[in-house]
Design a protein with these regions (language model features):
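Nucleotide-activated donor-binding/catalytic signature segment of Leloir-type glycosyltransferases, i.e.
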Residues: 139-163
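Short alpha-helical donor nucleotide-sugar binding micro-motif in glycosyltransferases
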Residues: 159-160, 167-172, 262
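Conserved acidic donor-binding segment of nucleotide-sugar-dependent glycosyltransferases
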Residues: 215-222, 231-236
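Conserved donor-binding/catalytic core segment of Leloir-type glycosyltransferases
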Residues: 44, 85-104, 110-113, 127
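Short hydrophobic beta-strand element within catalytic cores of glycosyltransferases
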Residues: 197-200
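Aromatic "clamp/platform" in nucleotide-sugar-dependent glycosyltransferases that forms part
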Residues: 180
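Donor nucleotide-sugar binding/catalytic pocket of nucleotide-sugar-dependent glycosyltransferases
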Residues: 37-78
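Glycosyltransferase donor-sugar binding loop
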Residues: 125-140, 158
Length: 271
């Protein structure tokens, strides 16, 4: 039997303005996905959003939904001490992790952060963790935007070691996601694991992954988002409530639980 595990393909039109090569690859990916529709016997999609993608591509076989298997023990490794010390300095840290790419909409994160910094907390920092490979023009445009609007402390880490990623998470006070295309969005789960309050724009699979954890935004309004950031960061009771909801959602992604379900699906449909 032929089995497919599907993680999604970024719509090429989202990448086209900044990375034509990546857009072409994604376009080819969609064509190949359609060609495989009648070649596989069973599919696992890591979100309902991804399942619907397969159905749109013409897949008639059985498709089950199972979240990504995440090795949470990796996140308990020691963070990079110098970087943690650098960012754990009393400055409020807003974080987003994910490759620098136009579908991730880091420009909207910077916009909301800039208003938060201007109107609520000048002692704040934005840490954008992720490699910009292929999207250097997009990164440069965002850097110019921050400079023109006098937004201070916007950090593009570039590609960094895993221990340094852990340090960024450990130092973070709030996770802000404005991405417009995610097949699952592992960083949401990572932020929940590190007990960082999450605000995320409700696009693609984002709402599905976040569940009842975190705060979902149904529209992009930078000023309202900045006010919400301030409210969450100042209200310890609200923070505790959000983190409690996130912890509850996190249980659904427990490694043993997902692994057991994966093996069960294979036994039922493949073996």
């Amino acid at each position: 039997k032929k089995v497919m595990i599907y993680h999604n393909i970024t719509p090429p039109e989202m990448l086209e303005p900044y990375n034509k090569a990546a857009a072409a690859d994604c376009r080819e990916g969609y064509e190949e996905l359609a060609k495989l529709a009648d070649k596989v016997d069973y599919c696992i999609a890591d979100s309902e959003y991804n399942k619907q993608d397969l159905i749109k591509a013409g897949y008639k076989c059985k498709i089950d939904v199972l979240p990504i298997l995440i090795a949470f023990s990796d996140y308990d490794k020691k963070p990079d001490a110098p970087l943690y010390g650098k960012y754990n300095d009393g400055v409020t840290n807003i974080i987003f992790t994910g490759r620098i790419a136009s579908n991730k909409c880091q420009q909207d994160v910077i916009h909301a952060f800039g208003l938060y910094q201007k109107y609520y907390n000048s002692n704040s920092r934005l840490i954008l963790v992720g490699n910009e490979g292929g999207y250097e023009t997009y990164k440069l445009k965002m850097q110019k935007y921050a400079q023109l609007n006098c937004i201070k402390n916007v950090i593009f880490t570039g590609h960094i070691r895993f221990a340094e990623i852990l340090a960024c998470y450990k130092a973070a006070d709030l996770f802000l996601c404005m991405s417009e295309h995610e097949g699952f969005c592992v960083p949401l789960v990572e932020a929940m694991y590190f007990k960082i309050p999450v605000i995320a724009y409700n696009s693609s699979a984002v709402g599905e992954t976040l569940g009842k954890g975190g705060i979902l935004l149904n529209e992009k309004n930078a000023l309202e988002t900045a006010a919400l950031m301030d409210k969450i960061l100042k209200d310890k009771g609200l923070q505790k409530k959000i983190i409690a909801n996130q912890n509850e959602r996190l249980d659904d992604f427990a490694h043993d639980k997902i692994l057991a379900r994966f093996n069960e699906l294979l036994r039922e449909n493949v073996l």
